[in-house]
UniProtKB/Swiss-Prot annotation:
Keywords tagged on the record: Acetylation, Calcium, Cytoplasm, Cytoskeleton, Metal-binding, Motor protein, Muscle protein, Myosin, Phosphoprotein, Repeat
Subunit details: Myosin is a hexamer of 2 heavy chains and 4 light chains: interacts with myosin heavy chain MYO19. Interacts with LUZP1; the interaction results in inhibition of phosphorylation of MYL9 by DAPK3.
Residues recorded as bearing Phosphothreonine in the entry: 19
Designated gene of the protein: Myl9
Residues engaged in binding Ca(2+): 42, 44, 46, 53
Name of the protein this chain belongs to: Myosin regulatory light polypeptide 9
Entry annotated with the keyword Secreted: no
Subcellular location as annotated: Cytoplasm, Cytoskeleton; Cytoplasm, Cell cortex
Gene Ontology biological process: stress fiber assembly
Amino acid sequence: MSSKRAKAKTTKKRPQRATSNVFAMFDQSQIQEFKEAFNMIDQNRDGFIDKEDLHDMLASLGKNPTDEYLEGMMNEAPGPINFTMFLTMFGEKLNGTDPEDVIRNAFACFDEEASGFIHEDHLRELLTTMGDRFTDEEVDEMYREAPIDKKGNFNYVEFTRILKHGAKDKDD
Protein backbone atom coordinates (compact mmCIF):
# COMPACT_ATOMS: atom_id res chain seq x y z
CA MET A 1 0.00 0.00 0.00
CA SER A 2 2.79 2.42 0.79
CA SER A 3 4.26 1.79 -2.68
CA LYS A 4 0.97 2.91 -4.25
CA ARG A 5 1.07 6.11 -2.21
CA ALA A 6 4.67 6.77 -3.20
CA LYS A 7 3.80 6.23 -6.84
CA ALA A 8 0.78 8.55 -6.63
CA LYS A 9 2.91 11.28 -5.10
CA THR A 10 5.41 11.13 -7.94
CA THR A 11 2.78 11.37 -10.68
CA LYS A 12 0.68 14.24 -9.28
CA LYS A 13 2.02 17.76 -8.97
CA ARG A 14 0.50 19.88 -6.27
CA PRO A 15 -2.05 22.38 -7.59
CA GLN A 16 -0.96 26.01 -7.51
CA ARG A 17 -3.24 28.55 -5.91
CA ALA A 18 -4.71 31.24 -8.11
CA THR A 19 -3.16 34.65 -7.53
CA SER A 20 -6.50 36.43 -7.31
CA ASN A 21 -9.99 35.56 -6.13
CA VAL A 22 -11.29 34.01 -9.32
CA PHE A 23 -14.68 33.33 -7.72
CA ALA A 24 -15.31 37.10 -7.61
CA MET A 25 -15.15 37.21 -11.42
CA PHE A 26 -18.38 35.22 -11.85
CA ASP A 27 -21.84 35.15 -10.33
CA GLN A 28 -23.14 32.03 -8.57
CA SER A 29 -25.05 30.70 -11.59
CA GLN A 30 -21.94 30.96 -13.78
CA ILE A 31 -19.83 29.19 -11.17
CA GLN A 32 -22.44 26.43 -10.98
CA GLU A 33 -22.34 26.00 -14.78
CA PHE A 34 -18.55 25.83 -14.72
CA LYS A 35 -18.73 23.26 -11.90
CA GLU A 36 -21.10 21.10 -13.97
CA ALA A 37 -18.77 21.36 -16.97
CA PHE A 38 -15.76 20.51 -14.79
CA ASN A 39 -17.56 17.45 -13.41
CA MET A 40 -18.46 16.28 -16.93
CA ILE A 41 -14.79 16.50 -17.97
CA ASP A 42 -13.44 14.95 -14.74
CA GLN A 43 -14.40 11.45 -15.91
CA ASN A 44 -12.61 9.56 -13.11
CA ARG A 45 -14.02 11.90 -10.42
CA ASP A 46 -10.68 12.51 -8.69
CA GLY A 47 -11.14 16.30 -8.51
CA PHE A 48 -8.56 16.96 -11.24
CA ILE A 49 -8.76 17.11 -15.02
CA ASP A 50 -5.92 15.10 -16.56
CA LYS A 51 -5.02 14.03 -20.09
CA GLU A 52 -7.09 10.85 -19.81
CA ASP A 53 -10.15 12.85 -18.70
CA LEU A 54 -9.78 15.14 -21.72
CA HIS A 55 -9.37 12.17 -24.05
CA ASP A 56 -12.46 10.40 -22.68
CA MET A 57 -14.56 13.56 -22.82
CA LEU A 58 -13.54 14.35 -26.41
CA ALA A 59 -14.06 10.70 -27.42
CA SER A 60 -17.60 10.87 -26.01
CA LEU A 61 -18.16 13.79 -28.41
CA GLY A 62 -17.00 11.66 -31.36
CA LYS A 63 -13.51 13.19 -31.54
CA ASN A 64 -10.24 11.27 -31.66
CA PRO A 65 -7.63 13.72 -30.32
CA THR A 66 -3.93 13.05 -30.82
CA ASP A 67 -1.58 12.76 -27.88
CA GLU A 68 0.14 15.98 -29.01
CA TYR A 69 -3.20 17.81 -29.04
CA LEU A 70 -4.01 16.62 -25.52
CA GLU A 71 -0.50 17.55 -24.30
CA GLY A 72 -0.95 21.03 -25.78
CA MET A 73 -4.22 21.46 -23.90
CA MET A 74 -2.69 20.25 -20.63
CA ASN A 75 0.34 22.53 -21.04
CA GLU A 76 -1.89 25.61 -20.94
CA ALA A 77 -2.20 25.07 -17.18
CA PRO A 78 0.75 25.83 -14.88
CA GLY A 79 -0.02 22.70 -12.85
CA PRO A 80 -2.74 20.14 -12.16
CA ILE A 81 -6.21 21.35 -13.11
CA ASN A 82 -8.47 21.41 -10.06
CA PHE A 83 -11.73 23.38 -10.13
CA THR A 84 -10.11 26.66 -9.05
CA MET A 85 -7.46 26.36 -11.78
CA PHE A 86 -10.20 25.46 -14.30
CA LEU A 87 -12.17 28.56 -13.32
CA THR A 88 -9.05 30.76 -13.46
CA MET A 89 -8.15 29.52 -16.93
CA PHE A 90 -11.67 30.06 -18.25
CA GLY A 91 -11.89 33.48 -16.60
CA GLU A 92 -8.70 34.63 -18.29
CA LYS A 93 -9.83 33.25 -21.66
CA LEU A 94 -13.28 34.85 -21.36
CA ASN A 95 -11.92 38.20 -20.21
CA GLY A 96 -9.15 38.11 -22.80
CA THR A 97 -6.56 39.48 -20.39
CA ASP A 98 -3.36 38.29 -18.83
CA PRO A 99 -3.21 37.30 -15.16
CA GLU A 100 -3.18 40.26 -12.75
CA ASP A 101 0.45 39.81 -11.67
CA VAL A 102 1.64 39.74 -15.31
CA ILE A 103 -0.07 43.07 -16.05
CA ARG A 104 1.18 44.66 -12.82
CA ASN A 105 4.74 43.45 -13.46
CA ALA A 106 4.67 44.93 -16.97
CA PHE A 107 3.92 48.36 -15.46
CA ALA A 108 6.45 47.79 -12.66
CA CYS A 109 9.26 47.58 -15.23
CA PHE A 110 8.86 51.34 -15.70
CA ASP A 111 8.40 52.21 -12.03
CA GLU A 112 11.99 53.06 -11.11
CA GLU A 113 11.14 53.76 -7.45
CA ALA A 114 8.90 50.68 -7.01
CA SER A 115 6.19 53.00 -5.66
CA GLY A 116 3.20 51.59 -7.54
CA PHE A 117 2.95 54.83 -9.54
CA ILE A 118 4.17 56.10 -12.92
CA HIS A 119 3.73 59.76 -13.86
CA GLU A 120 1.03 60.04 -16.51
CA ASP A 121 3.26 62.04 -18.91
CA HIS A 122 6.03 59.44 -18.71
CA LEU A 123 3.55 56.58 -19.20
CA ARG A 124 2.00 58.38 -22.20
CA GLU A 125 5.46 58.71 -23.74
CA LEU A 126 6.15 55.00 -23.17
CA LEU A 127 2.79 53.89 -24.55
CA THR A 128 3.03 56.04 -27.69
CA THR A 129 6.68 55.34 -28.57
CA MET A 130 7.39 51.70 -27.61
CA GLY A 131 6.10 48.26 -28.59
CA ASP A 132 2.56 48.18 -29.95
CA ARG A 133 2.23 51.96 -29.95
CA PHE A 134 -0.96 53.53 -28.61
CA THR A 135 -2.40 56.65 -30.22
CA ASP A 136 -2.88 59.74 -28.02
CA GLU A 137 -6.64 59.11 -28.29
CA GLU A 138 -6.22 55.57 -26.93
CA VAL A 139 -4.13 56.85 -24.02
CA ASP A 140 -6.76 59.55 -23.33
CA GLU A 141 -9.45 56.86 -23.26
CA MET A 142 -7.41 54.74 -20.84
CA TYR A 143 -6.79 57.74 -18.57
CA ARG A 144 -10.49 58.72 -18.51
CA GLU A 145 -11.34 56.23 -15.73
CA ALA A 146 -7.80 55.55 -14.51
CA PRO A 147 -6.67 56.18 -10.92
CA ILE A 148 -4.49 59.29 -11.36
CA ASP A 149 -3.81 61.53 -8.37
CA LYS A 150 -3.67 65.35 -8.34
CA LYS A 151 0.09 65.26 -9.01
CA GLY A 152 -0.44 63.25 -12.20
CA ASN A 153 0.70 59.91 -10.82
CA PHE A 154 -0.92 56.89 -12.46
CA ASN A 155 -1.60 54.17 -9.85
CA TYR A 156 -0.91 51.05 -11.90
CA VAL A 157 -1.53 48.67 -8.99
CA GLU A 158 -5.10 49.98 -8.62
CA PHE A 159 -5.52 50.22 -12.41
CA THR A 160 -4.59 46.53 -12.74
CA ARG A 161 -7.10 45.63 -10.03
CA ILE A 162 -9.81 47.62 -11.84
CA LEU A 163 -8.89 45.98 -15.15
CA LYS A 164 -9.25 42.48 -13.70
CA HIS A 165 -12.09 42.96 -11.20
CA GLY A 166 -13.98 46.12 -12.20
CA ALA A 167 -14.20 49.57 -10.62
CA LYS A 168 -15.39 50.11 -7.07
CA ASP A 169 -18.66 51.96 -6.68
CA LYS A 170 -18.20 55.70 -6.13
CA ASP A 171 -20.13 55.40 -2.84
CA ASP A 172 -17.57 53.00 -1.29
